Swiss-Prot record:
Subunit structure: Homotetramer.
Name by which UniProt lists this protein: tRNA U34 carboxymethyltransferase
Enzyme Commission numbers on file: 2.5.1.-
Chain's role: Catalyzes carboxymethyl transfer from carboxy-S-adenosyl-L-methionine (Cx-SAM) to 5-hydroxyuridine (ho5U) to form 5-carboxymethoxyuridine (cmo5U) at position 34 in tRNAs.
Catalytic reaction equation(s): carboxy-S-adenosyl-L-methionine + 5-hydroxyuridine(34) in tRNA = 5-carboxymethoxyuridine(34) in tRNA + S-adenosyl-L-homocysteine + H(+)
Gene designation per UniProt: cmoB
NCBIfam families in the cross-refs: PRK15068.1, tRNA 5-methoxyuridine(34)/uridine 5-oxyacetic acid(34) synthase CmoB
UniProt organism field: Psychrobacter arcticus (strain DSM 17307 / VKM B-2377 / 273-4)
Top enzyme category: transferase
GO BP term, example: tRNA wobble uridine modification
Keywords associated with the record: Transferase, tRNA processing
Sequence intervals crossing the membrane: none
Residue positions binding carboxy-S-adenosyl-L-methionine: K101, W125, K130, G150, D172, P173, S174, L208, E209, M224, Y228, R343
């Protein structure tokens, strides 16, 4: 069951890529693969929950939206919301749990007359905290084409649009995250549109390695929380580089450990209960990796230990979270005995 939200969003994506292709032939390969990318994520044979997720998005109530704040810590859709609409929307949005990246708020902040309390999607991650750490160090996003790799529900992609990006394309192969994005798109509507009416924020449900090599379409590429999941970090860095225009900016955020340029942790089995973590370099080692991959002007702009206030269990993500993955007797270590999660953000030029 597809509703107008998903169909219209996909049409806007197609028209955006078509406009690019008219100026840059590299975008034609994206256009030719787009139908396959979009059809695969809806295929029940590949994703058993896809029909249920589509139905949840299709049944969301249509609200009168007064304002959308894409550049606030809580991505806020200021809309008229009755009690019945609140109950309906909350139930449907909770069918898209777990919500990991956010937060989001839907409803009126005035609470006057018939208005219900806003819906607050309190996600597992305070993704706004990460954005606060990253944003001051970015080049100006105004008018730029941006690729957000591993964008989850799309929170950071919306923030990039709010910061003035001309076009943001979020990629992530998760069927759930794709439909979470579409649920938020349902309420955002055309609030992020250009003057000519084209949406600026789009989502393609594929991993980075599915994209055409060496597209060179983007002024800024973000890879946040992805590198440590890659079995070949240098291949990932080369793929990121291939999507950038010459002189473009890479924003890389990943797990790191203390140490010198020769220090890299390779977890034996799991790290913080994740079985798909392969390499945790020191900041110095990571700088060396980026330089070896051909990036220049590499700089580390932030290092932060992840706290149980930033990543935690909530009403909207009621599974295990960071507190369950740390040593109960020593929170500076994971349950496996490794250093607790610490994240660094590096910025580099192609």
């Amino acid at each position: 069951m597809l509703n107008n939200t998903i169909l219209h969003a996909e049409r806007e994506l197609y028209l955006t890529l078509l406009a690019w292709a008219q100026q840059q032939p590299n975008a034609y390969e994206w256009l030719t693969q787009l139908p396959t990318w979009l059809n695969d994520i809806k295929d029940k044979a590949n994703y058993a929950h896809a029909p249920a997720y589509q139905a949840s998005v299709a049944r969301l109530p249509t609200l009168t939206v007064d304002n959308v704040q894409l550049n606030s810590d809580i991505l806020t859709i200021d809309a008229q919301l009755s009690d019945s609409e609140r109950k309906q929307a909350t139930a449907l949005l909770k069918q898209l749990m777990p919500w990991r990246k956010g937060p989001f708020k839907i409803g009126s902040s005035q609470n006057e007359g018939e208005q219900a309390e806003p819906i607050f999607i309190d996600t597992e991650w305070h993704s706004d905290w990460k954005w606060q750490r990253v944003a001051p160090h970015l080049g100006n996003l105004k008018g730029r084409r941006v690729l957000d790799v591993g964008g989850g529900s799309g929170y950071h992609g919306w923030r990039m649009a709010g910061a003035g990006a001309d076009t943001v394309i979020i990629i992530d192969p998760s069927c759930l995250f794709y439909h979470q994005f579409m649920a938020i798109r349902h309420f955002v509507g055309s609030a992020d549109a250009h003057d000519i009416g084209r949406y600026r924020t789009h989502y393609i449900p594929v991993p980075l390695e599915a994209l055409p090599d060496n597209s060179q379409l983007f002024d800024t590429v973000f890879s946040m929380g992805v590198l440590y999941h890659r079995q070949s970090p240098f291949e990932h860095l080369q793929q990121l580089k291939g999507q950038l225009v010459k002189g473009g900016e890479l924003v890389l955020e990943t797990l790191v450990i203390e140490g010198d340029a020769n220090t890299v942790l390779v977890p034996h089995d799991r790290y913080a209960q994740m079985n798909n973590v392969y390499f945790l370099p020191s900041v110095a080692a990571l700088i060396g990796w980026l330089e070896k991959a051909g990036f220049t002007e590499v700089r580390c702009v932030d290092v932060a230990v992840t706290s149980t206030d930033e990543q935690r269990k909530t009403e909207w993500m009621n599974y295990h979270s960071l507190a369950d993955f740390l040593d109960p007797n020593d929170p500076t270590k994971t349950i496996e005995g490794y250093p607790a999660p610490m994240r660094a953000t590096l910025i580099a030029k192609k």
